[in-house]
Amino acid sequence: MTENIHKHRILILDFGSQYTQLVARRVRELGVYCELWAWDVTEAQIRDFNPSGIILSGGPESTTEENSPRAPQYVFEAGVPVFGVCYGMQTMAMQLGGHVEGSNEREFGYAQVEVLTDSALVRGIEDSLTADGKPLLDVWMSHGDKVTAIPSDFVTVASTESCPFAIMANEEKRFYGVQFHPEVTHTRQGMRMLERFVRDICQCEALWTPAKIIDDAVARIREQVGDDKVILGLSGGVDSSVTAMLLHRAIGKNLTCVFVDNGLLRLNEAEQVMDMFGDHFGLNIVHVPAEERFLSALAGENDPEAKRKIIGRVFVEVFDEEALKLEDVKWLAQGTIYPDVIESAASATGKAHVIKSHHNVGGLPKEMKMGLVEPLKELFKDEVRKIGLELGLPYDMLYRHPFPGPGLGVRVLGEVKKEYCDLLRRADAIFIEELRKADLYDKVSQAFTVFLPVRSVGVMGDGRKYDWVVSLRAVETIDFMTAHWAHLPYDFLGRVSNRIINEVNGISRVVYDISGKPPATIEWE
């Protein structure tokens, strides 16, 4: 009997903020299970979930609009602590008798909050002190509207020069509201505030740990598939590798891993995957050479969304064919993780926009013949890596930079051709090799090369050549929801450029991408 790791849990109501998923990630980092639901849940659903506490997220709407989202009134009647963040604070204030107004002074970015009154939420938490000894907190604001009157049974805990009610509290009911975003790293003490709310005020134990998550996942897999056989597409990436190890632990030889060499992989990746999982870990692996099939399906296609859908469709076709060669395979396992789901579809509030479909999610056809097993779909990337370490996977593999499911299919811009993939593989291998040699690989969060379908004139010796262009991309990020371009040294970039142009015949120019996320995404397609 596995321990109930969902015993203490936090319910996060999503009002559509771009930061909502970060709130969930922070709560999980504190060792507490949480779920992210749409704001318009019913009282019965909340009762059934039985949360230890509720967090109301931020959102893009204005609480002053007549039809703007509101928290279910039961949230404030359930007898559990409630923490409103930004929009969540504003709707809490309005619903409990306070007042919110639109403001000409939009507060966006860094702000300093002065703590005026003692509160369980921020007691003993400070970044600095005022001249008269009052605590100051460095926070990140992102709001237009602001609370102009708090409910009568609340007190003002903190304020800024332009925001008189930056933190409000009803200590007796354990209701708290903050006008800033504690979940983002720019709010320096934000994690401590969330910890104070989740662990102390809600009294949640740290039951959500890698070892316990593994036990729970193994039990769920066994319950879902029983004695059925499962097929998994194993790419050697973090997500599919951890999925393979979890399934191997749960069902052993009833798992067949299919390694599809689709012609869209990194240099020497096929050999590395077969060696590690076949020879070292002893998993049952079928190697399927399918480069020609994928490239034929992609021929003539320039649209990024269409390419992702094609790659997803052909993957499923290959899996179906391999499954038919085996007896009674009823389940297709995938390494879908929580950010895949978040980025691929609008949130249940309908406020988030579809950015791109992931081949693990949006690219799967409705007529897929097998059931889906997705043991990682509620986990963030950092949780997946920690689970992988617990399962015995090597650190270097788990902390390798992310690689997209469609592979080079979305790193070759426009039409995908074998010639382009071969050039890109070699250029990318040089970039990664030089990053490791310069001890820069672990200092950036993700680095890769993009093939641009653009020819540029170059000079080699006494002759001119007219060859292809590649772009180097390196970013720094904590959560992959936002990212800064990495300021790599000029001499390093020059060395990489020289090597690529001299060693990869067919590339005449190398550029460096200096776009952040937002407005750009990390991948080009």
UniProtKB/Swiss-Prot annotation:
Keywords: ATP-binding, Glutamine amidotransferase, GMP biosynthesis, Ligase, Nucleotide-binding, Purine biosynthesis. One of its GO terms (molecular function) is ATP binding. Residues 9-207 form the Glutamine amidotransferase type-1 domain. It comes from the Bacteria. Pathway: Purine metabolism; GMP biosynthesis; GMP from XMP (L-Gln route): step 1/1. The keyword Lipid metabolism does not apply. ATP binds at S235, G236, G237, V238, D239, S240, S241. Its EC number is 6.3.5.2. PROSITE patterns: GATASE_TYPE_1, GMPS_ATP_PPASE. InterPro entries: Class_I_gatase-like, GATASE, GMP_synth_C, GMP_synth_GATase, GMP_synthase, GMPS_ATP_PPase_dom, NAD/GMP_synthase, Rossmann-like_a/b/a_fold. The keyword Nucleotide-binding applies. It catalyses: XMP + L-glutamine + ATP + H2O = GMP + L-glutamate + AMP + diphosphate + 2 H(+). GO terms for cellular component: cytosol. SUPFAM superfamilies: Adenine nucleotide alpha hydrolases-like, Class I glutamine amidotransferase-like, GMP synthetase C-terminal dimerisation domain. It is an enzyme of class 6 (ligase). The active site is at C86 (nucleophile), H181, E183. Catalyzes the synthesis of GMP from XMP. Homodimer. This is GMP synthase [glutamine-hydrolyzing].
